């Protein structure tokens, strides 16, 4: 096992127990690495060195600047709903489908069990912003419905899982199996 010694002064535990005042007085830095069984066990420090270390820790724990950032920079404010443009338009970053999008998608033959997730919508908008095509609002919604249907088909009809979520075990025991 490798270890890092933070002082050039090293001594065995037996020598420290024999005369700790003399050992600490000889150390140039006010700290001695104490070894037991050829491995570092702990550090012995003089009261003066301990006071220096505590003062340094106190200094480092204070903020380094008097400048504070405004709290509103950290808050995600809800954007005001953007009115849907009339006629054909190119995709824009704040575009949203209608509130009854799932029902409309069902009328178009696309049954979505779950609402469109923010990730699915962001992916759709980013793709079509880059394309630069123009369509009516209803056509954009139809494209979104088809896009979500195709992406979910590869995942059993469900939205893609967040890779950061920890899965939970299934506690359900099917009929006919003992638990």
UniProtKB/Swiss-Prot annotation:
Residues 159-173 have a biased composition (Basic and acidic residues). The keyword DNA-binding applies. Keywords: DNA replication, DNA-binding, Primosome. It comes from the Bacteria. Residues 155-179 are annotated as: Disordered. GO terms for cellular component: primosome complex. The keyword Membrane does not apply. One of its GO terms (biological process) is DNA replication, synthesis of primer. Coiled coil: none annotated. Involved in the restart of stalled replication forks, which reloads the replicative helicase on sites other than the origin of replication. Can function in multiple replication restart pathways. Displaces ssDNA from a PriB-ssDNA complex. Probably forms a spiral filament on ssDNA. Belongs to the DnaT family. This is Replication restart protein DnaT. It comes from Citrobacter koseri (strain ATCC BAA-895 / CDC 4225-83 / SGSC4696). The lineage of its organism: Bacteria, Pseudomonadati, Pseudomonadota, Gammaproteobacteria, Enterobacterales.
């Amino acid at each position: 096992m490798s270890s890092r010694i933070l002082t050039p002064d090293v001594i065995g535990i037996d020598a420290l127990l024999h005369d700790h005042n003399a050992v600490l007085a000889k150390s140039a830095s006010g700290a001695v690495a104490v070894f037991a069984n050829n491995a570092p066990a702990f550090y012995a420090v003089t009261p003066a060195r301990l006071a220096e270390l505590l003062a340094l820790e106190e200094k480092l724990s204070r903020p380094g600047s008097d400048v504070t950032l405004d709290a509103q920079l950290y808050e995600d404010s809800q954007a005001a709903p953007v009115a849907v443009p009339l006629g054909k338009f190119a995709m824009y970053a704040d575009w949203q489908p209608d509130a009854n999008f799932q029902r409309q998608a069902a009328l178009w033959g696309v049954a979505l069990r779950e609402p469109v997730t923010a990730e699915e919508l962001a992916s759709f908008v980013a793709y079509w912003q880059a394309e630069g095509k123009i369509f009516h609002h209803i056509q954009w919604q139809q494209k979104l419905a088809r896009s979500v249907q195709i992406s979910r088909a590869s995942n059993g009809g469900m939205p893609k899982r967040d890779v950061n979520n920890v899965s939970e075990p299934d506690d359900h025991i099917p009929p006919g199996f003992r638990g």
